[in-house]
């Protein structure tokens, strides 16, 4: 292997590393270009898509009952009910006076406290089905855990084409592949070419030697002619 072939292979390796390393899945910023059309995620290169979901609910209730006995002064039984509500809290209070003037009051307090918890998921969208196999990716998009501690695989729907970078990548792949094939042919020709030429020259020399020997043998043989008289 000469210096030229070594340089060609080194250049090809470097270009291939840059191309493939630029195409491998990695963590991008949340501002990566991901277009959403009718609920379908579309991207050309691996992109990071951020989605957030909120969920919370908590409630508390309390019931209290009090009894107060008073001397009997009247036989009437009045009753009263009051209701008040403000900022998500409802308080219902009811009181009743029994025949024995024993005041029975009960109150119910229902309070709803909203506790909002935000879970942020980063979904890596990866394209697939490129023309050349150099740019083959996986067909699943992995959900990267942010602070939720959850990691799973979420299949997504996307389109693999639609950008100038993809076409440039395909052209670079074709050029790099052609250079690689040319380097292989040059190395094979450099190594095996002289041997093949030497074998061919040796075969030609052997054929010439055989033909010379046959001609010399025929020169020493007397020629016999037949004559007849009619």
UniProtKB/Swiss-Prot annotation:
Q: Where in the cell is it found?
A: Endoplasmic reticulum membrane
Region: Disordered, residue numbers: 55-90, 208-230
Keywords from the named record:
Endoplasmic reticulum, Membrane, Signal, Transmembrane, Transmembrane helix
Q: How does it sit in the membrane?
A: Single-pass membrane protein
Which N-terminal residues, if any, form the signal peptide? 1-22
**Which residue ranges does the entry give as Lumenal-facing topology?**
23-167
Where is this protein primarily located?
Answer: endoplasmic reticulum
One GO CC annotation: endoplasmic reticulum
The record places the following residue ranges in the Cytoplasmic compartment, namely 189-230
Domain of life of the source: Eukaryota
Sequence intervals crossing the membrane = 168-188
Q: What is this protein called?
A: Uncharacterized protein C16G5.06
């Amino acid at each position: 292997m000469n210096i030229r072939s070594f340089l060609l292979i080194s250049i090809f390796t470097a270009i291939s590393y840059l191309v493939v390393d630029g195409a491998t899945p990695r963590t991008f910023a949340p501002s990566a270009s991901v277009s959403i059309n009718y609920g379908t995620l579309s991207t050309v290169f691996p992109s990071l898509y951020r989605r957030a979901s909120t969920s919370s609910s908590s409630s508390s209730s309390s019931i209290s009952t009090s009894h107060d006995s008073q001397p009997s002064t009247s036989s009437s039984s009045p009753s009263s009910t009051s209701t008040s509500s403000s900022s998500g809290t409802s308080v219902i209070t009811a009181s009743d006076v029994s025949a024995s003037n024993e005041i029975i009051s009960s109150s119910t307090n229902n309070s709803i406290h909203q506790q909002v918890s935000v879970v942020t998921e980063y979904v890596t969208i990866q394209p697939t089905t490129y023309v050349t196999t150099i740019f083959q990716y996986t067909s699943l998009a992995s959900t990267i855990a942010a602070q939720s501690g959850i990691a799973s695989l979420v299949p997504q729907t996307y389109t693999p084409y639609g950008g100038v970078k993809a076409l440039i990548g395909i052209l670079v792949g074709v050029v790099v592949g052609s250079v690689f094939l040319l380097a292989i042919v040059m190395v094979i020709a450099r190594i095996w070419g002289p041997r093949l030429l030497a074998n061919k020259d040796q075969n030609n020399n052997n054929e010439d030697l055989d033909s010379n020997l046959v001609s010399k043998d025929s020169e020493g043989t007397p020629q016999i002619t037949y004559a007849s008289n009619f």
